[in-house]
């Protein structure tokens, strides 16, 4: 897995998550998000309170509430204690599997290879079916809980449905009925049916928050620019909006066209002088050009604009400072790197 770090991505995700945590037993600080550089639509929870999100989930969404709906679903697994229940169920199922597997081994030594292999396969299938049923119940429960989380916090939960429809189009031609049967998730059509029924019984048609949608659009363009080819990016982002300019500034930077990238970013900063992420990227490009002083100035401005401690930003400015020749700057750089480690050991 290629785990990526990005302040804009992390902060926006936490902002969406925080909206969902009212009247739950979870605190935002307890949840760890990890972002995987992968174009597939996916997110999952592992032991504890760790949520993994593929970048493809964000780049293929059209509305921030689709992303928020998936977060709500994963939070519901945590709130429901599904990860711990799953561990116990796996242990229980492994105990059931042992005698069936031994029956297969005995058959081999008795000279009945076909019978033995059939027994092993039957044993594996029966155990898998037991876990499949168990997991599908958890997924259905998480869908229902996600709807409740969204509606109770005045977020339109129909976007869980629109996300599933998007996922359905992606998987329709690639997943067989047999794979659906073995899948730990219920078939998407079944999930959509349950969600539709739930939504009919709730008043959940809330308007979107325009500021969040604008933030999402910028973040999406950034991720697409960093994870797709130049041809793909320029085909998608051909206009003069902030979203278009952001993507083109990044793809120009990645292509080595630093002067073009700097010109575009300065236009963006004139339009949105309080956006810290434009300043962050500007500093990164100056650093790549070898203009360390300008890199430090812009990263310092970015840190002032986010107005909260960031381990990632402390690490970045610390790295910039230690490249300077004077000892005072190097010492300041080390201090910032220590702050980064203190926040995120």
Describe each PLM feature range.
Residues 35-49:
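Catalytic zinc-binding patch centered on the HExxH motif and its immediate surroundings
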Residues 80, 253, 287, 321-324:
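Specific register positions within alpha-helical solenoid repeats of the TPR/Sel1-like families, i.e.
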Residues 29-32, 88-91, 95, 117-119, ...:
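Acidic/histidine metal-binding catalytic segments
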Residues 95-114, 118-130:
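Membrane-active amphipathic alpha-helices enriched in small hydrophobic residues
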Residues 65, 75-92, 110:
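Catalytic Zn2+-binding segment of zinc metalloproteases
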Residues 55-69, 134:
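Short pre-active-site segment immediately N-terminal to the catalytic Zn-binding motif
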Residues 1-7, 11, 33, 128-130, ...:
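Extracytoplasmic and endomembrane cell-envelope/extracellular-matrix remodeling and assembly machinery
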Residues 53, 69-77, 81-82, 142:
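Active-site recognition of the HExxH zinc-binding catalytic motif
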């Amino acid at each position: 897995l290629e785990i990526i770090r990005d302040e804009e991505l992390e902060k926006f995700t936490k902002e969406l998550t925080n909206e969902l945590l009212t009247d739950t037993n979870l605190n935002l600080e307890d949840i760890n998000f990890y972002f995987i550089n992968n174009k597939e639509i996916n997110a999952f929870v592992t032991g504890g309170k760790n949520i993994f999100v593929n970048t493809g989930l964000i780049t293929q969404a059209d509305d921030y509430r689709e992303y928020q709906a998936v977060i709500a679903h994963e939070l519901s697994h945590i709130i429901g204690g599904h990860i711990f229940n799953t561990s116990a169920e796996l242990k229980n199922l492994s105990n059931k599997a042992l005698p069936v597997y031994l029956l297969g081994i005995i058959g081999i030594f008795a000279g009945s290879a076909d019978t033995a292999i059939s027994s092993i396969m039957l044993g594996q299938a029966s155990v898998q079916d037991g876990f499949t049923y168990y997991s599908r119940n958890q997924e259905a429960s998480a869908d229902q809980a996600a709807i409740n989380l969204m509606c109770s916090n005045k977020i339109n939960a129909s976007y869980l449905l629109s996300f599933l429809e998007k996922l359905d189009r992606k998987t329709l031609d690639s997943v067989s009925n047999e794979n659906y049967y073995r899948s730990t998730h219920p078939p998407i059509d079944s999930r959509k049916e349950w969600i539709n029924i739930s939504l009919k019984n709730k008043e959940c048609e809330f308007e979107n928050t325009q500021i969040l949608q604008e933030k999402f659009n910028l973040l999406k363009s950034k991720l697409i620019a960093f994870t797709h080819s130049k041809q793909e990016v320029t085909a998608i982002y051909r206009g003069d909006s902030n979203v278009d300019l952001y993507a083109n500034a990044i793809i120009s930077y990645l292509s080595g066209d630093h002067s073009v990238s700097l010109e575009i970013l300065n236009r963006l900063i004139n339009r949105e002088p309080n956006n810290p992420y434009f300043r962050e990227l500007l500093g990164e490009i100056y650093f790549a050009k070898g203009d360390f002083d300008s890199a430090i100035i812009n990263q310092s401005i970015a840190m002032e604009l986010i107005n909260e401690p960031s381990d990632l930003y402390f690490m970045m400015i610390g790295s910039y400072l230690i490249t300077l020749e004077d000892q005072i700057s190097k010492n300041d750089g080390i201090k910032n790197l220590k702050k980064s480690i203190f926040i995120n050991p």
